[in-house]
Amino acid sequence: RHRARPSSTTAEMDWAGWALFGLVATTALTAALTAAQLAGLTRIDFPLLLGTLVTEDPDRARVVGFFLHLGAGQGFALGYTATFALLHRATWWIGALLGAVHVGIALTVLLPLLPGVHPRMASQRAGPASTAVLEPPGLFALNYGNQTPAVAAVVHIMYGVVLGLLLQPH
């Protein structure tokens, strides 16, 4: 007699993979973004943007912001890992699609909302007494350069590809 194998309706998440590969993917994204900045392709600086939420000193802000960015990358990697587990597979192209959705939300929702919560970012509602020193990103982060949306798309799709290649649901 043939016995049917029990099927699992829930895939287990790759916790060790998430912990390691989330850091790998975020470090790759940050390195690529920094390289694009140094090449003059964009003026966006995620570590500075995030770090100035905590401190006004730009040097300290970049250090603090780097670690905040790593933490945010881990949070997003958790979402990617959960998605791969739900789909029972992880591939480079699913990772790329998730990266495209990720950057789409970041450029059209998250970054445009930043002036409303960032204490050191200029906004149209801040008034004349504002001491804000950071330029708001604007829609698609175009205030940081015309190539910024393309740079952001490339590095976030790369982030998804890295996770899609390295993570495997169990």
Protein language model annotation of sequence segments:
Residues 2, 7-170:
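Juxtamembrane/disordered regions of integral membrane proteins
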